[in-house]
Amino acid sequence: MQPFTTHTGLAVMIDSTNIDTDQIIPKQFLSKVTRDGFGVHLFHDWRYLDDAGDQPNPEFSLNQSRYRGASILLAQENFGCGSSREHAPWALADFGLRAIIAQSFADIFYGNSINNGLLPVALTHAQVRQLMDEVAAEAGAQITVDLTSCKVVSPSGAEFSFTLAESARHKLLNGLDAIGLTLSHAAQIGQYETQIQGWRR
């Protein structure tokens, strides 16, 4: 998993609340169990005018040329609500997104994102609104997300602090998923197992 320290990237916004996981990645695309290949189906029902995905919706932000290559997504409150499918952060990451900035997140989606290297950043309504306004005002507007200092820097240079549990921050900074975190303690685990075997003799 790619470590996340500081990322500066083009921002795109979906100015909506309660964006659920079925909107992020509809259920008909969940048959695969590997992480790759879901990006093409991200927000399928919003990105396309047809079921086959052949007719892009020109009104949807992710299809607009000014947002092509965006790596930071802005949204409103309760992002990632609905079912607990891990495919949602898979699709967002596979599309090329590194961070989601919103007013709030559904708990399960929040945890799944961290476990898959996608940084969820919760800011206040006013802060998210300012970011959206600045991004809308200037094509190519970029946002910086600094996990080392837990700060977001807007296109105009305004700084907003955010919080993240230290355990989650450690995993993202070091590119560790749950398995990687366990393996990082392999020496201690081996020492403990050796000690246990000694007790059983």
UniProtKB/Swiss-Prot annotation:
EC number: 4.2.1.33
Biochemical pathway: Amino-acid biosynthesis; L-leucine biosynthesis; L-leucine from 3-methyl-2-oxobutanoate: step 2/4
Gene Ontology MF terms in the entry: 3-isopropylmalate dehydratase activity
Pfam families for the chain: Aconitase_C
Annotated keywords: Amino-acid biosynthesis, Branched-chain amino acid biosynthesis, Leucine biosynthesis, Lyase
Region forming the signal peptide: none
Gene3D superfamilies in the record: Aconitase, domain 4 (3.20.19.10)
Recorded GO CC terms: 3-isopropylmalate dehydratase complex
Source species: Shewanella baltica (strain OS155 / ATCC BAA-1091)
Identification of the protein by name: 3-isopropylmalate dehydratase small subunit
InterPro entries with a match to the protein in the record: 3-IsopropMal_deHydase_ssu, Aconitase/3IPM_dehydase_swvl, AconitaseA/IPMdHydase_ssu_swvl, IPMI_Swivel, LeuD
Record function comment: Catalyzes the isomerization between 2-isopropylmalate and 3-isopropylmalate, via the formation of 2-isopropylmaleate.
Subunit structure, interactors included: Heterodimer of LeuC and LeuD.
Keyword Transcription: no
